[in-house]
A protein has these predicted regions:
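Residue-level marker for beta-strand->alpha-helix junctions and adjacent short loops that shape enzyme
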Residues: 10-11, 78, 104, 125, ...
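Alpha-helix N-cap/loop-to-helix initiation residues
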Residues: 35, 79-80, 104, 225, ...
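Conserved strand-to-helix beginnings and helix N-cap segments that scaffold or border functional pockets
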Residues: 65, 83-84, 124, 226-230, ...
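Catalytic cores of alpha/beta
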Residues: 108-113, 259, 320-326
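Radical SAM [4Fe-4S] cluster-binding motif and immediate context
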Residues: 152-311, 316-318
């Protein structure tokens, strides 16, 4: 079969979406610089008898005139209107369409109105079955893997389908998060609550094969199991000569000087941090109980003192937010 994977660009939506564009343009540039691993992972578990292509609309155009047997689309909520437009157009042309990703997983019945099938949650474990069902004319409306994929058994992503111009590549050493922050899709999805790790040697081996010199770790958080991360950092220091971007919890980092030291020695140049708010009341509102606002300054200073940057993520519009939040 001819298979096309599509990552939609919401700015191209004809019927809706945020036309102010700033957020979408930032996300789009991030995808060009450091593309998601969803489709490279699915390509890796696709039998070689099938032909796979990928289009990221942030920097590529979709050829709707080309014949595809299956079109796979993933989308977050801000991308979903454009995703539905793409799905509707391909279905009109006779292609089967599968939609997955955070929005479709949260609202599968809605997504099904625009697709022949919807994948709920992580897809690697059921992708082969889906393709087999499609070939045999038995494609189901919904696919859901009862158990989360075992990361030990998954192959490395097929990066051959990515744009060769990307400057930063992504790697994942773990999945899942045991915390239940109300705003986060990961901790509120069935498989997302199950924290899983890849063997360290799998991670370092994959990084060695990546040509880019800057690697962004796509883990939900690298401070959930700090002993694992420390072991990984030691291996990266010994075996790999590259730079890294990590993501973690600010208060865990504040208390763990050893982790900061080892991450810097491994080549980490930046920690991405979900501060979310400078109001403790707002953090309680969304169950972000791991963050302690009074420790923010101390933690940021510690990271800086170890020679690493801090990239902070914030949200605004909580019920308790006032103008002073800015």
């Amino acid at each position: 079969m001819n298979i096309l994977f599509v990552h939609p660009n919401p700015d191209l939506s004809k019927t809706g979406g945020d036309k102010r564009g700033f957020f979408h343009k930032v996300i789009g540039k991030m995808n060009v610089l450091c593309p998601p691993l969803t489709f490279p992972m699915l390509s890796a578990v696709t039998p070689r008898k099938h032909k796979v292509e990928m289009v990221d609309e942030c920097h590529q155009k979709i050829d709707f005139e080309k014949n595809y047997d299956l079109v796979g689309i993933t989308a977050m909520t801000h991308e979903i209107i454009r995703a539905y437009e793409i799905a509707d157009e391909f279905r009109k042309r006779g292609a089967k369409v599968v939609i997955g990703g955070p929005h479709a997983s949260a609202l599968p019945e809605e997504a099904k109105q625009h697709a022949d099938s919807v994948v709920i949650g992580e897809a690697e474990g059921i992708w082969f079955k889906l393709l087999e069902d499609l070939e045999n004319g038995r494609l189901k409306s919904f696919y859901f893997q009862k158990k989360p994929p075992d990361l030990t058994g998954l192959p490395a992503p097929d990066r051959n389908i990515l744009n060769r111009l990307i400057l930063v590549n992504g790697v994942q050493s773990s999945r899942g998060c045991p915390y239940r922050c109300k705003y986060c899709f990961v901790g509120n999805s069935t498989h997302g609550r199950v924290f899983r790790k890849r063997p360290v040697e799998y991670v370092t081996g994959e990084i060695k094969r990546v040509r880019q010199k800057l690697i962004n770790f796509y883990d939900t958080s690298m401070t959930i199991d700090t002993e694992y991360t420390k072991t990984l950092c030691k291996a990266l220091k010994e075996e790999v000569n590259k730079k890294f971007i990590f993501l973690g919890n600010i208060n865990t980092l504040c208390k763990d000087d050893e982790l900061l030291k080892l991450s810097r020695e491994a080549g980490c140049i930046q920690w991405n941090i979900g501060f979310e708010s400078i109001s403790q009341e707002s953090l309680r509102e969304v169950n972000k109980n791991t963050n302690k606002v009074k420790e923010y300054y101390k933690a940021v200073k510690k990271i800086h003192d170890h020679g690493m940057f801090v990239h902070g993520f914030f949200m605004f519009g909580f019920d308790h937010d006032k103008r002073t939040i800015f």
